[in-house]
């Protein structure tokens, strides 16, 4: 009977150790993925200074040409603002600027033109309602674009790192508890 109890303990300890090691390995893999995907986007985002933007003009453009190529037809909003004492183009997020530098706001669904147009009109009306709003500008003066919302700010980076850190901490705690339990059982068996 004593032998069965010891075997059950060892089997349970082995399973707990496997769980802890698996959690640590998953956390390390997740950290690697985040470091190769999210961290470069965070470092590339130069719009760190929060400032007040004053609306200058808004235009809705139906079709643009980019470097001699016509892009698929969808309505896009073009917003000019005055931020940090200089004229600038407002972009919704970093991704908007990368997708099409001629558009400040690209609607979510561009499949249905009428729905996309209504979405752009609604956003334009909100900008015209509120002439002064907060935006993110680059600290260096040569950047001619500002962001309405940062996707890759410090909060996004911390939120991305929360779950892998939680997983790593939990795995290490499980391993530490199993090892301390083994050590204490060896001490108790020696007495």
From Swiss-Prot:
Tissue specificity of this protein: Abundantly expressed in smooth muscle. Low levels of expression in most other tissues. Within the brain, relatively high levels found in hippocampus and corpus callosum.
Molecular function GO labels: calcium-activated potassium channel activity; potassium channel regulator activity
Spans within the Extracellular topological domain: 40-157
Topological domains, Cytoplasmic: 1-18, 179-191
Membrane topology designation: Multi-pass membrane protein
Pfam families reported in the protein's UniProt record: CaKB
Annotated transmembrane regions: 19-39, 158-178
Glycosylation sites: 80, 142
CC per GO annotation: plasma membrane; synapse; voltage-gated potassium channel complex
InterPro entries: K_chnl_Ca-activ_BK_bsu (IPR003930)
Lineage: superkingdom: Eukaryota
Protein's GO biological process: chemical synaptic transmission; detection of calcium ion; potassium ion transport
Keywords in alphabetical order: Glycoprotein, Ion channel, Ion transport, Membrane, Transmembrane, Transmembrane helix, Transport
Family in the record: Belongs to the KCNMB (TC 8.A.14.1) family. KCNMB1 subfamily.
Subunit note: Interacts with KCNMA1 tetramer. There are probably 4 molecules of KCMNB1 per KCNMA1 tetramer.
UniProt-listed PANTHER family: CALCIUM-ACTIVATED POTASSIUM CHANNEL SUBUNIT BETA (PTHR10258), CALCIUM-ACTIVATED POTASSIUM CHANNEL SUBUNIT BETA-1 (PTHR10258:SF1)
Role summary: Regulatory subunit of the calcium activated potassium KCNMA1 (maxiK) channel. Modulates the calcium sensitivity and gating kinetics of KCNMA1, thereby contributing to KCNMA1 channel diversity. Increases the apparent Ca(2+)/voltage sensitivity of the KCNMA1 channel. It also modifies KCNMA1 channel kinetics and alters its pharmacological properties. It slows down the activation and the deactivation kinetics of the channel. Acts as a negative regulator of smooth muscle contraction by enhancing the calcium sensitivity to KCNMA1.
Protein name, per record: Calcium-activated potassium channel subunit beta-1
Annotated source species: Homo sapiens (Human)
Highest classification ranks of the organism: Eukaryota, Metazoa, Chordata, Craniata, Vertebrata
Gene coding for it: KCNMB1
């Amino acid at each position: 009977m004593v032998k069965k109890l010891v075997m059950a303990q060892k089997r349970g300890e082995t399973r707990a150790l496997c769980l802890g090691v698996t959690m640590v390995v998953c956390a390390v893999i997740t950290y690697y993925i985040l470091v190769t995907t999210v961290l470069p986007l965070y470092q590339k985002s130069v719009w760190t200074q929060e400032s007040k933007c004053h609306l200058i003009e808004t235009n809705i453009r139906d079709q643009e040409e980019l470097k001699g190529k016509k892009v698929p037809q969808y309505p896009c909003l073009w917003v000019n603002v005055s931020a940090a004492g200089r004229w600038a183009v407002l972009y919704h997020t970093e991704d908007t600027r990368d997708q099409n530098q001629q558009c400040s706001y690209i609607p979510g669904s561009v499949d249905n033109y009428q729905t996309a147009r209504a979405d752009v009109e609604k956003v334009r009306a909100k900008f015209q309602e509120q002439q002064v709003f907060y935006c993110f500008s680059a600290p260096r003066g040569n950047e001619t674009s500002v962001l309405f919302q940062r996707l890759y700010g410090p909060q996004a980076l911390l939120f991305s790192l929360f779950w892998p850190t939680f997983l790593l901490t939990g795995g290490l705690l499980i391993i530490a508890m199993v090892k301390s339990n083994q050590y204490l059982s060896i001490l108790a068996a020696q007495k």
